[in-house]
Design a protein with these regions (language model features):
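Short glycine-centered helix-capping/turn motifs at secondary-structure transition points
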Residues: 112, 132-133
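Second-shell residues forming the walls of enzyme active-site clefts
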Residues: 1-118, 125
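Short amphipathic alpha-helical coiled-coil/interface segments
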Residues: 123-130
């Protein structure tokens, strides 16, 4: 992790320090950090632990396009959207099947897998950025 912070994450830390409003998280896997091959965009270790907690980012986190093979090869649109939100992502970009992703999130909230408070956290971050524009 120290090597990652000292090298690959330097531009992200600088962006955070300079007040970036958005960060796009790609689908690269970092098994040395996360312990598995989960894409960074779906990993709570990468989104919440590293980006939000270690780097101190409080803005909007958006996924890279969710219709890419790194996601669609393993996850349904619904599972990918739910997993990304659970990881700490605020906005889902281009799911392969929008209706399925939307319904998956709605079902996860209705079933308690994702709390309404979690959704409200994302909404608040998005509104805060919009008001700054």
């Amino acid at each position: 992790m120290d090597d990652l912070l000292a090298n690959e994450l330097v531009p992200f830390q600088q962006a955070v320090n300079n007040g970036a409003s958005f960060v796009m998280v790609g689908h690269i896997s970092a098994p040395a950090v996360t312990g598995d091959d989960t894409p960074a965009s779906l990993s709570s270790v990468m989104v919440t632990d590293v980006l939000r907690n270690q780097l101190g980012f409080h803005g909007v986190v958006i996924t890279d396009a969710m219709n890419m093979g790194a996601v669609t090869g393993t996850y349904s649109s619904a599972d990918a959207a739910v997993t990304a939100i659970q990881a700490g992502v605020d906005m889902i970009l281009m799911p392969e099947d929008f209706q399925s992703a939307y319904q998956g999130v709605m079902d996860a909230v209705a079933g308690g897998t994702i709390t309404e408070d979690r959704i409200n956290e994302s909404v608040a971050r998005i509104i805060k950025v919009k008001l700054k524009m």
